[in-house]
Curated annotation (Swiss-Prot):
Gene Ontology annotations of biological process type: DNA-templated transcription initiation
Species of origin: Stigmatella aurantiaca (strain DW4/3-1)
DNA-binding region per UniProt: 251-270
Protein name per its UniProtKB record: RNA polymerase sigma-B factor
Residue positions of motif Polymerase core binding: 74-87
The entry's keywords: DNA-binding, Sigma factor, Transcription, Transcription regulation
Function recorded in the entry: Sigma factors are initiation factors that promote the attachment of RNA polymerase to specific initiation sites and are then released.
Amino acid sequence: MQISNDPSSHSGSLTMYLSEINQYGLLSVEEEQALARKFVKGDLAAGHRLVTSNLRFVVKVSYEYRSYGIKMSDLIQEGNIGLMKAVQKFDPDKGIRLISYAVWWIRAYIQNYILKSWSLVKLGTTQAQRKLFFSLARTRRELEKFGAGDGAVVNVDEIANKLNVKASEVREMEQRMGGRDLSLDAPMGEDGGNSHVDFVASAAAPQDDEFADKEEAGLINSRVHMALMRLDPRERFIIEQRVMNERPMTLKELGEHFGFSRERARQLEIRAKDKLKAELAALLAEVDPDAAAALQ
C-alpha cells in the first residue's frame, strides 16, 4: 500500500501535512465497509482511501505522547504504520468502526517506537521507572484538567500522591523527560488563534474522538489483541468461543467442533488460557508492570 506517511517529507513540515490530511473526508459506516470489502479482494485504491480518511486520528493519538521528547513527525509516522497494519487486518463484518480497531495498532506502534528510542539513561532500568515513564505525562494532564480550572498548576507532590511514588522519583523522571516537542501547540497564524492540533480535532467525528481519548482502554485492548495473535488458530478459536463470545460454546460443543471429547476440550481450554495470560503479561510488562503482575 503506497502512501506518503512521513510528515517530515512535506516542505512545510507539520503545518502542510495537517492541512493536507484534513482534505480527506471522513467515511460513513457504509462507505467504510464497502471500501474494506474491496480492499480484501485486492483493491489497493480502496485501502489507500481507508488510510487517508483516518490519518487525522493518528495525529490526535500521537499528540497524547508529545511529552516524551520525540519529534511529533516521528510519532505520527509510526502511528501511520500502525494504521496501515490495521487496515490490512480489518474485518468489516465484525460490527465496529475501523478507527476503533485501528487505535489499538496505532498506540502499539507508537509505544514500541518510544521504548526503542529512549535510552536506558532516560527511561530507567527498573519496572517502577518504566511504569512511571508512561504514567507521568498522562497523570499531569489529568490533574490539570480536573484541577482548579484551566491552566491550574499541578505540583510534584500531587503527582507523586496520585501515582503512589516519592516526589523525588517524579522530579528525577521529569528531568529525564525534558525537551518535549511543542510544534502542534504552536498557533497556526500570527493572530495567535487555534493551534494545529485544534485544527485536527475540530474535524474529528465526536464518537471516534471520544474513543480515541480513552487511553487506558485502548492500551489494554491493543495488548489483548496482540496476545491473541500470538496463539495458534485453534487456541485463538477456543479463547474467542469460550471467553470472548457473548454466547460461549459449551465444552461439549467445542469438542464436537474439533472431533474430540469434552475432557480433551477442557484440557485444551486451560492450556489456551494459560498461554494467553503468559503472552498478555509479557506485552503489558512493557508499559504497566502492575497489570502484568496481576496476571501471574
